[in-house]
């Protein structure tokens, strides 16, 4: 019962980040705000594993925390702050992401009006941010779309790259991955140039 109450509190806090009825655009401020709210909600939960036992010698300082909704990779075995969270993998509908999307929703709901161009390439750019540095692209295979990814950069030093990825199975979002990583302005601008180059060739 206590766990269910904590999970209910977590879900309530997480869903404050966006309505699942309509997917929103994704920019650095939105990504950063969502991470902060997620970290605050996460502090109400206890992992189902012992994160201290998950330290990978090949990746020192990184711990894997397991929860009912999925996993969190963080730079601590304790309660992580937003800055300490490196990756979130969501496998259930218990978490709403920064764009208002949950696992189980459709590809069309995740795209929110964006269209995937006809291309023989394995990567298709859907749009770029009007302000700031960011873009969205889709991963394409023989079976159609198997992933859609938003990237956006907080260019305030130290520069941070936020990545939001939807794993697509058929026409359904089967997983959501959120990542935050250190970057540079040069890397952000190079990535945007690559996205624009791909878009120009479509």
Model-derived features with residue positions:
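Second-shell loop/turn segments in exported
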Residues: 94-101
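Bacterial N-terminal signal peptides
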Residues: 10-18
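Short, compositionally biased strand/turn segments
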Residues: 81-93
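Short, aromatic-enriched amphipathic alpha-helices that serve as compact interaction elements
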Residues: 31-38, 94
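A cross-family detector of function-defining hotspots
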Residues: 27, 40-80, 107-187, 191-201
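Bacterial N-terminal signal peptides that target proteins for export
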Residues: 1-8
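Sec-dependent signal peptide cleavage junction
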Residues: 19-29
């Amino acid at each position: 019962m206590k766990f269910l109450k904590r999970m209910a509190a977590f879900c309530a806090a997480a869903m404050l980040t966006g309505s699942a009825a309509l997917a929103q655009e994704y920019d650095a401020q939105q990504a950063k705000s969502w991470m902060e709210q997620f970290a605050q909600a996460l502090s109400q939960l206890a992992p189902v594993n012992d994160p201290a036992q998950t330290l990978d010698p090949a990746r020192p300082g990184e711990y894997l925390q397991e929860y009912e909704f999925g996993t969190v990779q963080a730079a601590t075995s304790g309660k992580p702050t937003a800055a300490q969270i490196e990756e979130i993998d969501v496998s259930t509908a218990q978490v709403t992401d920064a764009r208002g999307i949950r696992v189980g929703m459709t590809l069309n709901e995740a795209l929110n009006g964006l269209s995937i161009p006809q291309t023989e390439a394995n990567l298709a750019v859907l749009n770029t941010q009007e302000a700031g540095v960011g873009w969205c692209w889709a991963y394409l295979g023989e079976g159609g779309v198997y992933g859609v990814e938003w990237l956006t950069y907080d260019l305030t030093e130290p520069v941070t790259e936020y990545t939001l990825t939807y794993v697509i199975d058929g026409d359904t979002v089967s997983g959501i991955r959120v990542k935050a990583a250190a970057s540079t302005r040069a890397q952000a601008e190079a990535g945007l140039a690559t996205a624009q180059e791909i878009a120009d060739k479509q």
